Curated annotation (Swiss-Prot):
Pfam families: RNase_HII. Keywords: Cytoplasm, Endonuclease, Hydrolase, Manganese, Metal-binding, Nuclease. InterPro entries: RNase_HII, RNase_HII/HIII, RNase_HII/HIII_dom, RNaseH-like_sf, RNaseH_sf. It is an enzyme of class 3 (hydrolase). GO terms for cellular component: cytoplasm; ribonuclease H2 complex. Residues 14-197 form the RNase H type-2 domain. This is Ribonuclease HII. Its EC number is 3.1.26.4. A divalent metal cation binds at D20, E21, D112. It comes from Wolbachia pipientis subsp. Culex pipiens (strain wPip). Its cofactor is Mn(2+); Mg(2+). Endonuclease that specifically degrades the RNA of RNA-DNA hybrids. PANTHER family: RIBONUCLEASE H2 SUBUNIT A, RIBONUCLEASE HII. Manganese or magnesium. Binds 1 divalent metal ion per monomer in the absence of substrate. May bind a second metal ion after substrate binding.
Length: 197
């Protein structure tokens, strides 16, 4: 398996942040973005990859390693913001907040995908960036673990939806629970199939 590396970062100079989001598709919960900067590219953390390719246990281990050596910022767009705007605008908002929470002046921002937020720094959009750039891949891990932990906390308040397991995604079990119990304030009211209930 080919792992992301610093090849993209090494074509640029200065302070470079990788940004990725998680939680665009679920029916419940916020969208979370993370921004990660490796100030010392000689630091090697084996196994960093797109978070979707990793087991939950592996993500947890890598999260602890990444956050102990890298600078990182977390940004969130709430369910209210997702309902008020749309998921694309809410995602961009969460990315901006993650970058702002770094509290650093940057030279470049590497963003996974092709719809980056408008920020004051130079931005490079990279499709499949979480499989190419180690900074973006690390951001995907930090964002995923952060959101998963949040959904597990929300599960304790609303166990009937089993968010501990499905993390708010539209599984058959989650949809069945919505049919039985209705929706909570944590559900995205403008997402199908909730919108048509």
């Amino acid at each position: 398996m080919k792992y992301p590396d610093f090849s993209l970062e090494n074509t640029l100079s200065g302070i470079i942040a990788g940004v990725d989001e998680v939680g665009r598709g679920p029916l419940a919960g916020p969208v979370i973005s993370a921004a990660v900067i490796f100030t010392d590219r000689d630091t090697v953390i084996d196994g960093i990859n797109d978070s979707k390719k990793l087991t939950p246990k592996c993500r947890q281990v890598l999260y602890e390693k990444i956050t102990s050596v890298a600078k990182f910022g977390i940004g969130m767009a709430s369910v209210e913001e997702i309902n008020s705007y749309n998921i694309l605008q809410a995602t961009k908002l969460s990315m901006k907040r993650a970058l702002a929470n770094l509290n650093l002046e940057l030279d470049y921002v590497l963003v996974d995908g092709n719809q980056p937020p408008e920020v004051k720094w130079q931005v490079k959009s990279i499709v499949n960036g979480d499989s190419l750039s180690i900074s973006i891949a690390a951001a995907s891990i930090v964002a995923k673990v952060t959101r998963d932990r949040l959904m597990e906390e929300l599960h304790n308040k609303h166990p009937q939806y089993n968010w501990y397991k499905n993390k708010g995604y539209g599984t058959k079990e989650h949809l069945s629970a919505i049919g039985l119990h209705g929706i909570t304030k944590h559900h995205r009211k403008n997402f199908a199939p909730i919108r048509i209930l």
